[in-house]
UniProtKB/Swiss-Prot annotation:
GO cellular component: cytoplasm
Catalytic activity: S-adenosyl 3-(methylsulfanyl)propylamine + putrescine = S-methyl-5'-thioadenosine + spermidine + H(+)
Alphabetized UniProt keyword annotations: Cytoplasm, Polyamine biosynthesis, Spermidine biosynthesis, Transferase
Protein's name according to its UniProt entry: Polyamine aminopropyltransferase
GO biological processes: spermidine biosynthetic process
Pathway assignment: Amine and polyamine biosynthesis; spermidine biosynthesis; spermidine from putrescine: step 1/1
Annotated family: Belongs to the spermidine/spermine synthase family.
Its job: Catalyzes the irreversible transfer of a propylamine group from the amino donor S-adenosylmethioninamine (decarboxy-AdoMet) to putrescine (1,4-diaminobutane) to yield spermidine.
Residue ranges of domain PABS in the record: 7-253
Subcellular location per the Swiss-Prot or TrEMBL entry: Cytoplasm
Lineage: Bacteria, Pseudomonadati, Pseudomonadota, Gammaproteobacteria, Vibrionales
Major site of localization recorded for this protein: cytoplasm
UniProt xrefs under NCBIfam families: MFS_SpdSyn
Length: 300
């Protein structure tokens, strides 16, 4: 029987999953196994894409334009995370959990060159690939920490560190590490917020986990904005603060002030406030996710 290279099979599957790209016009330029996942970098027309295949079979794709002068962020769900700037438009200290191709850190570094940024990425291979293939270049104000985010956040809390913008982006499209979803973890993260800081979480909009996750965030942060883009049916962004949340009018005014600065990244920030809601659309009696009860893998 003829044997088939598993990388070829993987590539074919990736091309099938990554709409609107087609199989025949894509080229693998790098593939590598890490301790956590198989990583493939491939090109299609004017895009370069990063795909992960984890040990349990989950997959995620992120793409950037090959032209380093083209700052546009390709995927809407990635652009959505910059909605946090509506709540704190001048963050001086930024914490990002999950690097990927580095689109968001690169955008924030350009927007706020004097701000200090800490990025936590568990997989050192991802950091290497982001720099080699996706133009991610940490500035003198940016530090990439290799390790588990839960450990980093716990240690940062013990040191009394505070951040104005915290992005939880350890989301790969189908899976978030379950120890990064519990009430205990969110309490530890909440302690890192500055008095005017914003928490931004990129997560699911539809799954069996939705009710449990929403109830858990509500138990820790109280009221939060639920931000969904209709055509992005699989994603949502949760936004919350320690202080009372701004109303829709204040968000719209801030969006107008940010529109020009965010245009190069294809972020239509002026459309975001109307897509945010404070209304609960989940079972408010759902059991909270805790370190003792966090079946995230089963509920996805």
């Amino acid at each position: 029987m003829m044997s088939i290279n598993p990388i070829v099979l993987l590539f074919a599957l990736l091309c099938t999953l990554l709409s609107p790209f087609s199989i025949g016009q894509s080229t693998i330029i790098h593939e590598q196994k890490s301790l956590y996942q198989d990583i493939v970098v491939f090109e299609h027309q004017d895009f370069r894409c990063l795909s992960f295949t984890a040990k349990k079979g989950e997959r995620v794709q992120t793409c950037e334009y090959q032209d380093p002068q083209d700052k546009r962020i390709y995927f809407p769900y990635v652009r959505m995370t910059l909605a946090g700037l509506l709540f704190n438009p001048k963050p001086e200290r930024i914490l990002i959990i999950g690097l990927g191709g580095g689109s968001v850190p690169s955008a924030l570094a350009e927007l706020y060159p004097e701000s200090h940024m800490d990025i936590v990425e568990i997989d050192p291979v991802v950091s290497q690939i982001a720099e080699r293939y996706f133009y991610f270049q940490p500035s003198h104000n940016t530090r990439v920490h290799t390790g588990d985010a839960r450990v980093y956040i716990k240690r940062a809390g013990l040191k009394g560190q505070k951040y104005d913008f915290i992005l939880l982006d350890a989301f790969n499209g189908e899976y978030i590490p379950e120890h990064l979803m519990t009430r205990e973890f969110l309490m530890e993260t909440k302690q890192l917020l500055s008095s005017s800081g914003v928490l931004v979480a990129n997560t699911f909009s539809t799954s069996k986990l939705y009710d449990h996750e929403s109830a858990t965030y509500r138990s820790v942060f109280g009221e939060f904005y639920n931000f969904k883009i209709p055509q992005e049916s699989g994603n949502r962004v949760i936004l919350s603060m320690l202080i009372p949340l701004p109303n829709q009018q204040a968000l719209q005014q801030q969006a107008e002030a940010l529109t020009s600065a965010l245009q190069p990244f294809a972020i239509e920030i002026e459309n975001y406030p109307s897509l945010m809601t404070l209304e609960a659309d989940w079972d408010e009696q759902a059991r909270l996710l805790t370190d003792q009860f966090s079946p995230a893998n089963l509920l996805k």
